[in-house]
């Protein structure tokens, strides 16, 4: 299989020697994106088996940032809450927006080899965006709170606040479903495929489908 022999790789990320902590709000989309990338690089390069929990605004896609870290042999896991749009007048083109989101998480599932776990929920859009800094990234060392339009962010290393958000996140997971599951067991994969297809269809297995 030619595809199986392809070596996927990326240039290593730059070094970040310290957390960019500040008591002030971070303003401007460029500054917000920059501090998010710096925090992620710092955490996975200074800690082992890092666990990251996050709930991101639709505008923020971290596919490249995480693939960059995973493909350079950094060991960490990510759990993400995904908001999927309902079919309603409040959410224009919900199917297209949900497919776009799916297209960004599939590469993460493959690059992470099972270390990326996306959980999804559907809810009223206004309820989701009822707070100015409702989105967040939780790491071992800090909490990043992010506005929906990426214009503003706040970073905190308060351990009590980090613990509070982490417990809140775990509570939310109990009401969400795992969107994609990865398995290295070929029999589990085949069984899942067969169970999801019609019993009277013909199954054909090829080395290069």
Task: Describe these PLM feature segments.
Residues 67, 93, 158-160, 167-168:
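Surface-exposed beta-strand edges and their flanking turn/coil or helix-capping segments
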Residues 104-111, 134-148, 168-183:
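A short, terminal or domain-edge coil/loop segment
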Residues 26-33, 60, 95-99, 155-162:
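Generic detection of long, well-ordered alpha-helical segments
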Residues 118-161:
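HKD (HxKxxxxD) catalytic microenvironment of the phospholipase D
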Residues 114-120, 144-152, 179-195:
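Short flexible/disordered coil segments
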Residues 4, 31, 95, 111, ...:
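A sequence-composition feature that detects small, non-aromatic residues
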Residues 87-129:
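HKD-type phospholipase D/PLD-like phosphodiesterase module
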Residues 2-85, 166-209:
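PLD-like (HKD) phosphodiesterase/transphosphatidyltransferase domain
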């Amino acid at each position: 299989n030619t595809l199986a022999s392809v070596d996927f790789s990326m240039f290593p990320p730059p070094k970040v020697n310290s957390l960019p902590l500040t008591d002030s709000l971070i303003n401007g989309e460029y500054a917000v994106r920059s501090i998010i990338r710096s925090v992620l690089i710092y955490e996975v390069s200074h800690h082992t088996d890092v666990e990251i929990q996050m709930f991101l605004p639709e505008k923020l896609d971290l596919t490249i940032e995480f693939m960059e870290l995973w493909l350079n042999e950094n060991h960490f896991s990510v759990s993400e809450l995904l908001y999927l749009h309902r079919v309603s007048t409040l959410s224009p083109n919900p199917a297209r927006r949900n497919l776009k989101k799916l297209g960004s998480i599939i590469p993460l599932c493959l690059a992470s080899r099972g270390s990326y776990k996306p959980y999804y929920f559907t809810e009223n859009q206004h309820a989701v965006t009822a707070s100015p800094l409702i989105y967040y990234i939780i790491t071992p060392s800090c909490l990043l709170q992010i506005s929906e339009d990426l214009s503003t962010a706040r970073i905190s290393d308060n351990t009590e606040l980090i613990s509070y958000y982490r417990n809140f996140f775990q509570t939310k997971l109990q009401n969400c479903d795992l969107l994609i599951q990865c398995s290295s067991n070929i029999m589990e994969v085949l069984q899942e495929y067969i169970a999801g297809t019609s019993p009277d269809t013909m199954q054909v297995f090829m080395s290069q489908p």
